[in-house]
Every structure is written in C-alpha cells, then in structure tokens.
Curated annotation (Swiss-Prot):
Protein known as: Alpha-globin transcription factor CP2
Disulfide topology: none
Domain annotation Grh/CP2 DB: ranges: 61-300
Pfam families assigned to the protein according to its UniProt record, in alphabetical order: CP2 (PF04516), GRHL1_C (PF25416), SAM_3 (PF18016)
Organism listed in the record: Homo sapiens
The UniProt record lists the keyword Transmembrane helix: no
C-alpha cells in the first residue's frame, strides 16, 4: 500500500504562494532591472569588500616570528592604508627599541641559555640612494668629521652585552643579548633626512631612512654568523623637536579631513612594530665600491712624485661575485636567495639545489615568480651584470714610464716595424654609470686607495698642452674605451693633488 501525505487545503495554498514568491525572487537574477538596479559585480567591487579581501593575511603571514622589535615612537597618521608605516624621529634623541622573544615552547632550543647578536643599521629607503650609498656616506663623513650616523645610548639601555660601534662603519652598531632576559636598547640617529636631498631652492623634503635589525646565533666556531631573524621600519629624521612639529602637523591635517577621507589612512599607533624583511647582505654592491668604512687602508698618494713603476701599479680590489654554482647545496641556495632579495620565494625553492635553480628556464622563473621578480631572478641566476654606460682605461704615469716612452720613440726611428724592447704598460679599467666629474674623482681615488678629498681638480690635456677642467658634459662626450695616462701636480694651497688626463 502506498502512503501519501495529503496537506490540508489551507496548507496547500500557503505552499503554492511560497513557491511563487521564491520563483519571483529568482527571476530577476542576471537581468537588468532598471537604471537604479545593483549588479553583484558592482557590489563586490565596493571598497569595503576590497579592503576585507586584501586584509586577509596570506599563509606566510600567519607564522609567529621568533623575535619582535618595537620602536617606542608614534607612527605618522598621514600614511595611507596598506602602505608601510612611517615614524618621525628627532636628531640625536634617544629612542627605545624593545627586543622581545616570541618563540613558542620548543622553538629554537639551540639558543636557550645562550646569547644572540643583533646588528642595527640606518640605511636608505630609496633604491636610487641605495645604489650610491657608499658615496653618500663618504660625503657625510667628510662634512661631519668625527660624528657618527648611529649610536647606542649605553647608560639608558638594559640587557645589552658588549656593545660595539665600529669607527669605520658610521651607520652600524651591534651588541649581544640574552632572549630570556629583558632587553631594551636606546639608539640615537645623528643625521637628518634633508642632508641627502638635492639642494635646489630650500624647503626640500627629506629622504626616508630604514632602521634594520639583523639577529644571528652562534655557530660551531663561536662566530655569530647563522641568521635568525631580520626586521626593519621606515623613518624620517628631523632637527631637534622637528619630529614633534611634523607629527602635530600631520595630525591637524587629518582632523580637517572628512570621515570618508580618513578611512583611507592608517591610525597613528603609539609604537612602531618593525616588520620582517630580508637580511642585510654582507656585500651590498657588485662593483668595486667597498662597503662604507671597511677600506681603512689609506696609502700615500705617490702619483705625482714619479717614483711609481708602470709595471707595479696599485691593484684595485677584485670584483665581488655572488654567483650561484651547480655544487651549491639547498641550504646554501636559501642563503643566496636571501642575500639577493628573493626572500619571498625561499619557501617555494626549499628543496632546490644550485643545479636545480640553474636548470630553470626564463619562462619557468617568470611563471613561478611573476614577470618582474622572474626576470630579476633569471638574470641573477645567470650572473648577468649591467653593462656600464662608459668604460675608460687609465695608466699611472711615472718617471720610468717617461724614460721608456722616450726610449721607444728613439728605437722606433731605428726599427720601422715598431717592435721595441718588449715592455708593456698596465692599464686599469674604470666603469662609469653617472658620467659625472664627482664619480670619476671617486673612481680614481678608489683605484689608488686614497681619499677623494686628496684630489683637488681633474684636468684633460688639450691641444698645445693646455689643461681643460673636466666637467660632467666633457665626460659624457668621452669615447668608449678611451685610454688615458694619469699625471699629477701638487696643489698650491694644501696637500691635495691635481690629476691630468693625457
């Protein structure tokens, strides 16, 4: 017997009405209902939904970092949502940075009861200034003799051990500390942001800096070289009390904005949390520029005295290479990715050795990393250097060189084939990117291990032996791979020299 459930008449009427209402509510989906109708795509495109979507952290942001560094200074309220925070500091004022241990139970047990080493740096935020950091810091050193860019306020600091400030690294300090104990370090930044701007008409904006902290643990040999954690934040430094005035100005500007405009900006926080970043590379540049302060050997400038041999000239420092090799282990490959600013892809390439990475084609890395980072990674893997804008060759003139040149001229009169006594002269290549007289001065000074301040002027020997002052425009008109002999004259007023390109 089949059983059928029969609804009363009233229930059947209700059910029929509900079905009709539901059908009616669905009938308009996907159709244009009129000028005032909303489409679902328009609704999802509203800023509120976009913000909620972008605020969802990716998987790698959910991880708890082993350490956290907190700068006790308020962030600016004039920073837009999703932009990095910006913090204003006063020149020479002591600011506390709290060193916090965030490790979970059982995480990094090898540092329990041991010290770690943290290195603090003040570096440039702008990529353009990062490329010329050596020149910028050297210029600051000569304008502010005896001063440092970064210092530790030792009396106010707590829990730091063996603080050090290398006299040749003006922007770096370091110390040891125990993660299990309370540690706070007070730092002072002595340079201001406007010292590195192009002076034009006054009132210029200052360049932003970065405070970066790199922490290392001890290796088997007792050296603190194994990287644990790195974090940084963006700052601007003002003259005393200037940061307070700037913070007040930003706050007043925000108060004048409408509630809708305020939603586009971050609130001001009482402290600044340093965010995770790539470790600072041990070797910053791939050209011959030494790291600020590490080249402390200033040999005497013997160019003009005629006592140097053309066959025994000062050797420039060897070019720095950081190429990935097929024999590189997966662990070394991870370190290479960090050093070359590919930290975001270390998880993707966890098990890749050097040989695995080098086998990737251009299309492979672009598909994995995206067009911008993919091309950058491919060029880094292949060790491709950027071709300099101008290459010139220089040779140091000396008394022996003059004598040999005279001998060659005499022998050439006897031997028309030009085959003289077989001597040859060593030239050094100078690679120029900015094509300026300042850059040429620095390159020549670096080549002969002297200070740029010891070079007063650079001249080019012109027709009839006249001395033409080198300018930016003249350098821009140098021929590629032009050869010059360097001669010198003692300056009249001080211990510097004039360089003559022949």
């Amino acid at each position: 017997m089949a059983w059928a459930l029969k609804l009363p008449l009233a229930d059947e009427v209700i059910e029929s009405g509900l079905v009709q209402d539901f059908d009616a509510s669905l009938s308009g989906i996907g159709q244009e209902l009129g000028a005032g109708a909303y489409s679902m795509s328009d609704v999802l495109a509203l800023p509120i939904f976009k913000q909620e979507e972008s605020s969802l952290p990716p998987d790698n942001e959910n991880k708890i970092l082993p350490f956290q560094y907190v700068l006790c200074a308020a962030t600016s309220p004039a920073v837009k949502l999703h932009d990095e925070t910006l913090t204003y500091l006063n020149q020479g004022q002591s600011y506390e940075i709290r060193m916090l241990d965030n490790r979970k139970l059982g995480e990094l047990p090898e540092i329990n009861g041991k010290l770690v080493k943290s290195i603090f740096r003040v570096v440039f935020h702008d990529r353009r200034l990062q490329y010329t950091e050596h020149q910028q810091l050297e210029g600051w050193r000569w304008n502010r003799p005896g001063d440092r860019i970064l210092d530790i306020d030792i009396p106010m600091s707590v829990g730091i051990i063996d603080p050090r400030a290398n006299p040749t690294q003006l922007n770096t300090v370091e110390f040891l500390w125990d993660p299990a104990k309370r540690t706070s370090v007070f730092i002072q930044v002595h340079c201001i942001s406007t010292e590195f701007t192009m002076r034009k008409h006054g009132g210029e904006k200052g360049v932003p800096f970065r405070v970066q902290i790199d922490t290392f643990k001890e290796n088997e040999n007792g050296e603190y070289t194994e990287h644990l954690h790195s974090a940084s934040c963006q700052i601007k430094v003002f003259k005393p009390k200037g940061a307070d005035r700037k913070q007040k100005t930003d706050r007043e500007k925000m108060e004048k904005r409408t509630p809708h405009e305020k939603e586009k900006y971050q609130p001001s926080y009482e402290t600044t949390i340093l965010t995770e970043c790539s470790p600072w590379p041990e070797i910053t540049y791939v050209n011959n520029s030494p790291s600020p302060g590490f080249n402390s050997s200033h040999s005497s400038f013997s160019l003009g005295e005629g006592n140097g041999s053309p066959n025994h000239q000062p050797e420039p420092p060897p070019p720095v290479t950081d190429n990935l090799l097929p024999t590189t282990t997966p662990q070394e490959a991870q370190q290479w990715l960090h050093r070359n600013r590919f930290s975001t892809f270390t998880r993707l390439f966890t098990n890749f050795s050097g040989a695995d990475l080098l086998k990737l084609t251009r299309d492979d890395v672009i598909q994995i990393c995206g067009p911008a980072d993919g091309i950058r990674l491919f060029n880094a893997l292949k060790g491709r250097m950027v071709r300099p804008r101008l290459t010139i060759y220089v040779c140091q003139e000396s008394l022996q060189l003059r004598e040999q040149q005279q001998q060659q001229q005499q022998q050439q009169q006897k031997h028309e084939d030009g085959d003289s006594n077989g001597t040859f002269f060593v030239y050094h290549a100078i690679y120029l990117e900015e094509l300026t007289a300042v850059e040429l001065t620095e390159k020549i000074a670096q080549l002969f291990s002297i200070s740029p301040c010891q070079i007063s002027q650079i001249y080019k020997q012109g027709p009839t032996g006249i001395h033409v002052l080198i300018s930016d425009e003249m350098i821009q008109n140098f021929q590629e791979e032009a050869c010059f002999i360097l001669d010198t004259m003692k300056a009249e007023t001080n211990d510097s020299y004039h360089i003559i390109l022949k």
